[in-house]
Amino acid sequence: MGDRRFIDFQFQDLNSSLRPRLGNATANNTCIVDDSFKYNLNGAVYSVVFILGLITNSASLFVFCFRMKMRSETAIFITNLALSDLLFVCTLPFKIFYNFNRHWPFGDTLCKISGTAFLTNIYGSMLFLTCISVDRFLAIVYPFRSRTIRTRRNSAIVCAGVWILVLSGGISASLFSTTNVNNATTTCFEGFSKRVWKTYLSKITIFIEVVGFIIPLILNVSCSSVVLRTLRKPATLSQIGTNKKKVLKMITVHMAVFVVCFVPYNSVLFLYALVRSQAITNCLLERFAKIMYPITLCLATLNCCFDPFIYYFTLESFQKSFYINTHIRMESLFKTETPLTPKPSLPAIQEEVSDQTTNNGGELMLESTF
């Protein structure tokens, strides 16, 4: 009898020592995770993204629309990417207020619009980056055969398809983004019930992950790998000359933005959806998912600040326009009463910026694409 009591005591002691390691679980198997740090983190990151993203993407759109006039196929993709970033940035003041005050006073409609803008930007950015990567692949690997495919009309059609796809997914997910009132505090885009996750959101998440992340990731990696392999060929090197370094920089920046901003978020989102729908009931994994989700979410929103680097390294005419406009602004700040040198007229500047190359092989692979 004494041995039995000793064994029961040892078993209870072992069970109590293991319980904290499995997470703070209560008697009804619910896992308690404190993720309240996300509000201050999101508010701070959103504030930075709003300031930098608004300035850089507004300036970029001005250059694309009024200086370059979207004369190349790649410029059309990049213009739509900048537009996606700018639309999302314009909704950030509402999110900043919400995260710092932990209260959403703007109503259910703005909550849905804010959620749609976020999803549209994240997955629209990945798809537009994929379009740029595929366009670069066609221009370098098949410079002559791709002439009939790489047209401004086809680029516009592809962009329209991307917008329809991401808006459909964003609106579908945001239909469940209703505001919830708890203790006189209104929340937005959080607090979904387990039933909603199991019935709807888990399926929507899987669809968005496959179409908006896995397929673009495969295409980006594949196209970039083939382009890098093609650049090693002597025939390609003789065509593009010293611009090989520019192409390498462009691919590096492109893949860096994709990997840093989107891979962590989408990887954690998949785990987060499994946890919230209770497909996985391990408390340790649930804690990991709920802690890492807001962190990777902030990384994903930083793409609005990093995308202008892609604009700069992808379009040589964008670099020219950026340099010319910066030079003019600096001259206007420090100009004297009697100008020492005549300034170029605006038509001349526009002509210089929007100059397009001819259709020979080397120029086709560079200026019209990058």
Swiss-Prot record:
Compartments in which it is found: Cell membrane
Annotated GO MF terms: lysophosphatidic acid binding; lysophosphatidic acid receptor activity
Organism: Mus musculus
Stretches that traverse the bilayer: 44-64, 74-94, 113-133, 156-176, 204-224, 255-275, 295-315
Topology term for the membrane: Multi-pass membrane protein
Domain of life of the organism encoding this protein: Eukaryota
Tagged with keyword Disulfide bond: yes
Function statement: Receptor for lysophosphatidic acid (LPA), a mediator of diverse cellular activities. Transduces a signal by increasing the intracellular calcium ions and by stimulating adenylyl cyclase activity. The rank order of potency for agonists of this receptor is 1-oleoyl- > 1-stearoyl- > 1-palmitoyl- > 1-myristoyl- > 1-alkyl- > 1-alkenyl-LPA.
Keywords attached to this entry: Cell membrane, Disulfide bond, G-protein coupled receptor, Glycoprotein, Lipid-binding, Membrane, Receptor, Transducer, Transmembrane, Transmembrane helix
Similarity-based family: Belongs to the G-protein coupled receptor 1 family.
Gene giving rise to this polypeptide: Lpar4
Paired cysteines (S-S): C111-C188
Cytoplasmic compartment segments: 65-73, 134-155, 225-254, 316-370
Glycan-linked positions: N15, N24, N28, N183
Cellular-component GO terms for this entry: nuclear body; plasma membrane
Extracellular compartment segments: 1-43, 95-112, 177-203, 276-294
InterPro entries registered for this protein in UniProt: GPCR_Rhodpsn, GPCR_Rhodpsn_7TM
Chief localisation class: membrane
Protein name as annotated: Lysophosphatidic acid receptor 4
Xref: PROSITE patterns: G_PROTEIN_RECEP_F1_1, G_PROTEIN_RECEP_F1_2
